[in-house]
Amino acid sequence: MCIRDRLISELNENKGSTSLSFRQKMSEEAFTETASYDAMISNYFIEKNKTSFPNKKVISTNLVEKLRYGENPHQIASIYSYSLSTNLDQLHGKKLSYNNYNDIYAALNASKSLPAGVGTVIVKHANPCGVSINKNKVGSFKEALSSDPISAFGGIVSCNFKINIKLAAELSKTYFEVIIGNGYEKDAIRILKKRKNLRIIDSSKIKLENINSIVSNFNSLLIQSPDNKKFESKNFQVVS
């Protein structure tokens, strides 16, 4: 219901007046909106002046959706975004949970850091249990899966390339909670949709951005520059 309709309803219910609770709610929304606008201006000048860590940090985000619960059923949770959406397109499956989002972002941070078009990452409980670089799409997935097929069961697969029909058929052989692709062939989606509860995510709009990483603990925030270094095969050594 828009503010106008809420006001009309309030006036009708209170004989031309408004209740204290309504006025407090309107004050909350008004000051939140102006504070968000001021935060945008503040962050513009912080970026313009290249100030890494200002004396006061103002963060403004938008509610994307309220989630069923948090990491555990007794926790309440929501997801917010610096823009108006997460840029994740869900093509199929049940609604994403807090743990799904947590795993998805862990998987994307890893897969997007690999050379484009060849990287596959499998994540379980926000930790990678398989990573592969291979120009052959099916080969890339199979190598990642072979790293730890037991842990991979029920996990999340993130491919930094377009998923084709051959790979979709291979992915369907193992139970996964979420499949993330940088786009999909139509026939690939058709095959994956045969798994009713599988969440299919298109991440083609997601890019590694220069946004600080923030972790909250008690009354403090740990803030650091993003870990968006690109890795290549030459960066790794087999030591045993």
Predicted regions and their residues:
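ATP-dependent carboxylate/acyl-activation modules
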Residues: 36-41, 45-240
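Cofactor-pocket helix-loop regions in the catalytic cores of large enzyme subunits
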Residues: 6-49, 55-59
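Short, small-residue-biased leader/transition segments that mark boundaries at the very start
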Residues: 1-3
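Short, compositionally biased low-complexity segments
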Residues: 5, 9, 79-82
